[in-house]
Curated annotation (Swiss-Prot):
Catalytic activity reported: tRNA(Ser) + L-serine + ATP = L-seryl-tRNA(Ser) + AMP + diphosphate + H(+); tRNA(Sec) + L-serine + ATP = L-seryl-tRNA(Sec) + AMP + diphosphate + H(+)
Encoding gene (name): serS
Positions of L-serine binding: T233, S234, E235, E287, S387
Name this polypeptide is given: Serine--tRNA ligase
Molecular function in Gene Ontology: ATP binding; serine-tRNA ligase activity
GO biological process: selenocysteine biosynthetic process; seryl-tRNA aminoacylation
Description of how the protein assembles with itself and partners: Homodimer. The tRNA molecule binds across the dimer.
InterPro entries: aa-tRNA-synt_IIb, aa-tRNA-synth_II, aa-tRNA-synth_II/BPL/LPL, Ser-tRNA-ligase_type_1, Ser-tRNA-synth_1_N, SerRS_1_N_sf, SerRS_core, tRNA-bd_arm
Keyword terms, alphabetized: Aminoacyl-tRNA synthetase, ATP-binding, Cytoplasm, Ligase, Nucleotide-binding, Protein biosynthesis
A Pfam family hit: tRNA-synt_2b
Similarity comment: Belongs to the class-II aminoacyl-tRNA synthetase family. Type-1 seryl-tRNA synthetase subfamily.
This protein's record includes keyword Mitochondrion: no
Known pathway: Aminoacyl-tRNA biosynthesis; selenocysteinyl-tRNA(Sec) biosynthesis; L-seryl-tRNA(Sec) from L-serine and tRNA(Sec): step 1/1
Length: 426
């Protein structure tokens, strides 16, 4: 959520910035009308509350003197209904203004390139050289079918489309990848391993901005009067650990990682990547989350992105780093780097990690704060999140980049300790 002061005092300027940077149209006239009504009703509410308090005090004083208080009581009763109605109206207006605020995306950093979509993203660097094959390259679906590793048909019987059953050595490789990533981030990168719930409440999703805007992409459960959501990413529970908390300055940056299942309805995917495991309703990811001081978040963002890069480098997977343009960034982000891994079957780079600095946008929603030792007062923290990395897509990249002519897969050296020393799987 943006600073409410921007909405109150600079709505026209804010609307122009949102229009040019995000393609978002803010209804300034509606906002100004609501704000004018809020101010008017708030003034009247405060007048009535002050009057109630003064008359209540007068009643107490009169009773202490043994005087008749019926006239004062009648006066209080006369404006009590107006006060109640005024308080209800004020709450309703605040809710309407908050609903508008919750639907406004974050403002991009000044150094984020302007653009409409992924075609305007700016490549920052590349690592590794794509392998030249002397045989016909198979994609992960063909490799999986050839070896009996990936079973979409059985998964469809069990759950429908966009699910996959992994069997045998490929299931082991998938598990090895997740273990390798968690060990790397905890052992070398200083993140604390955290095991989080896969079901969260609506407040958690509002805190990290999935609600209310992206509800259609969430899986929702209801048991009796209890409603919970399956997490779309462990960013949600990890970041919400500091919701309504004041973190001591010496604990920052707070770095957490979690390997978890993730669940997405893919409502806006438009039928893309229906073949194979690129885009699934259920997938696994190793997530990185940092809570930092505002002045440190830029450096923390660079560090987090580098931690994700190291995963790909240790696996020997060629990739490129891309700075997302204003039109391709996520709703909550101030700035985002994507890492895209090389897939030989597509002869292109595909996203495998997205690392974002959200500034104080999520923290304001969550009231996640830190105590500034310079002032002794609580201030909004900055939140960052990134994939470190998507496990299924890493498995796809390993399968395709390390495939052999006979359909076997060479196990990357970094994974062999997790595979019982196996050098190939077939």
């Amino acid at each position: 959520m943006l600073d409410p002061a921007l909405l109150r005092h600079q709505p026209a300027d804010l609307a122009e910035r949102l229009r040019t940077s995000r393609g978002f149209e803010l209804d300034v006239s509606a906002l100004e009308s609501l704000e004018a009504d809020r101010k008017r009703i708030q003034v009247r509410t405060q007048e009535l509350q002050s009057l109630r308090n003064s008359r209540s005090k007068a009643i107490g004083q009169a009773k202490a003197k043994g005087e008749d208080v019926s006239a004062i009581m009648a006066e209080v009763a006369a404006f009590a209904d107006e006060l109640k109605a005024s308080e209800v109206a004020l709450d309703e207006l605040r809710e309407k203004i908050e609903a508008i605020s919750m639907g406004i995306p974050n403002l991009p950093a000044d150094d984020v390139p302007a653009g409409a979509d992924e075609n305007d993203n700016v490549e920052q660097s590349r690592w590794g050289t794509p392998r030249q094959f002397d045989f016909k390259v198979l994609d992960h679906v063909e490799l999986g079918a050839r070896n009996g590793w990936l079973d979409g048909e059985t998964a469809a019987k069990l759950s429908g489309s966009r699910f996959t059953v992994l069997r045998g050595p490929i299931a082991r490789l998938h598990r090895a990848l997740a273990q390798f990533m968690v060990d790397l981030h905890t052992g070398e990168h200083g993140y604390e391993e955290t095991n989080v719930p896969l079901l969260v409440n609506a407040d958690s999703l509002r805190g990290t901005s999935q609600l209310p805007k992206f509800e259609d992409d969430l899986f929702k459960t209801a048991v009796g009067d209890s409603t919970r959501y399956l997490i779309p990413t462990s960013e949600v529970p990890l970041t919400n650990i500091v919701r309504d908390e004041i973190v001591d300055a010496e604990r920052l940056p707070l770095r957490m990682t979690a390997h978890s299942m993730c669940f997405r309805a893919e409502a806006g995917s438009g039928g893309r990547d229906v073949r194979g495991m690129i885009r699934q309703h259920q997938f696994e990811k190793v997530e990185l989350v940092s809570i930092s001081r505002p002045e440190d978040s830029d450096a923390e963002h660079q560090r987090m992105t580098r931690c994700a890069e190291v995963v790909l480098e240790k696996l020997g997977l060629p990739y490129r780093k891309v700075l997302l343009c204003t039109g391709d960034m996520g709703f909550s982000a101030v700035k985002t780097y994507d890492l895209e891994v090389w897939l030989p079957s597509q002869e292109t780079y595909r996203e495998i990690s997205s690392c974002s600095n959200c500034g104080d946008f999520q923290a304001r929603r969550m009231q996640a704060r830190w105590r500034n030792p310079a002032t002794g007062k609580p201030e909004l923290a900055h939140t960052l999140n990134g994939s470190g990395v998507a496990v299924g897509r890493a498995m796809i990249a390993v399968m395709e980049n390390y495939q052999n002519a006979d359909g076997s897969i060479t196990v990357p050296e970094a994974l062999r300790p997790y595979m019982g020393g196996l050098e190939t799987i077939a």
